[in-house]
Regions:
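Extracellular glycoside hydrolase catalytic/binding regions
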Residues: 58-73, 141-161, 165-293, 297-301, ...
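Feature marks short, surface-exposed loop/turn motifs that line or immediately flank catalytic pockets
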Residues: 48-52, 98-100, 131, 168, ...
Length: 333
């Protein structure tokens, strides 16, 4: 989810460091070509209950900082099976940040990625800024080192996708495109079809990124929420969504969208007379008709009424059957 829009800071320092990143010679395993079209992404976000913007480790709901690799793997295995069986999901989006990868948590946290892969899920590894930042990369060297570690570990796995930065809202589109293209140069052995580039701002428009030749061949990440307008008709939300896609639906994955799931809303009604119902209907109907993938926020995040799943013993259960039906409709079921 998005943090409140902050003032821009550290842009000049970050852009200067991006130049160094582009010149870096990072050696990673040659990965196979990507084969997935965006309609194949039927996903959920597994989020930290504190939110993924964090100055320390990001720890998805249900995991603990003291967990070992085997403990993380076991929990993630149970949860990913629930995402598959309860929802029909085949994609899991997981957060990282520099402390999570540079410190001891990474050794355990890899268990979540590995368990999802073992269950034949695609995994989107997305980088969040730290909580003290303002939509810009806090420390470019740490960000570069984080991605070097992650790509070295998973660059050779065709089911892992890399999202260099979530919601780069502290940059203009041209600044962000420069940084993203630097990432592509630094990690050139990763097929571009397995790199998901955030849209401008809060991932809220992808037109500039889609039009950039520097980012050609990449996938694009779009976020959209029903709180971003007060529309109550599906047609109004469809128009809003299409303006954000900018003609690049074929390359776009909506990596965040959602609505309240624990408040009793029936998502199978009021598609033309309800703010959240019409919003979710617009996204899912358009995804189905236009053939692009979606990753729901959140699949699991206790305390967030958007959460599609809730803890139930050692497993998970659905929080809103109508919401599940509507999300699955968008996935082509």
């Amino acid at each position: 989810m998005s943090a409140p829009a902050p003032a821009h800071r550290r842009i000049a320092r970050t852009l200067a460091a991006a130049t160094l990143l582009a010149a870096s010679a990072l050696v990673v395993a040659q990965a196979p070509p990507a084969v997935a079209a965006t309609s194949q992404f039927k996903g959920v976000n597994w989020a930290d209950t504190r939110d993924n913007y964090n100055s320390g480790w990001v720890i998805p709901d249900g995991l603990a900082a003291s967990d070992s690799y085997s403990q993380v793997y076991s929990i993630a295995d149970s949860y990913t099976k629930a995402f598959v069986n309860n929802l029909g999901a085949n994609t899991l989006r997981l957060p990282i940040n520099p402390p999570s990868v540079s410190q001891s948590w990474w050794g355990a946290y890899k268990g979540a990625i590995d368990a999802a892969l073992h269950n034949n899920m695609k995994v989107i590894i997305g980088a969040w800024t730290e909580s003290s930042s303002v939509g810009t990369i806090t420390d470019m060297t740490a960000w570069q080192n984080m991605w070097s570690t992650v790509v070295s570990a998973y660059g050779g796995n065709g089911n892992v996708y890399f999202e260099p930065l979530n919601e780069p809202y502290g940059y203009s589109s041209s600044q962000w495109i420069s940084i993203a293209s630097s990432w592509l140069s630094a990690f050139s052995s990763v097929p571009r079809g397995r790199v998901i580039i955030a849209g401008t701002g809060y991932d809220d428009h992808v037109g500039d990124e889609g039009a950039s030749s520097a980012l050609s061949g990449t996938l694009l990440s779009l976020h959209m929420y029903g709180t971003w307008a007060s529309s109550t008709t599906e047609s109004a939300w469809v128009s809003n969504l299409n303006s954000r896609l900018g003609g690049y639906a074929s390359r776009t994955v909506i990596t965040e969208f959602g609505g309240p799931m624990t408040t009793g809303i029936n998502y199978l009604t009021n598609h033309n007379n309800g703010q959240y119902q019409s919003f979710v209907a617009a996204v899912t109907d358009t995804a189905r008709s236009d053939g692009f993938g979606t990753v729901y926020w959140a699949g699991l995040k206790t305390g967030d009424n958007y959460s599609m799943e809730a803890h139930n013993g050692s497993g998970l259960s659905n929080t809103n059957s109508s919401g599940v039906t509507q999300i699955r409709w968008g996935w082509g079921y």
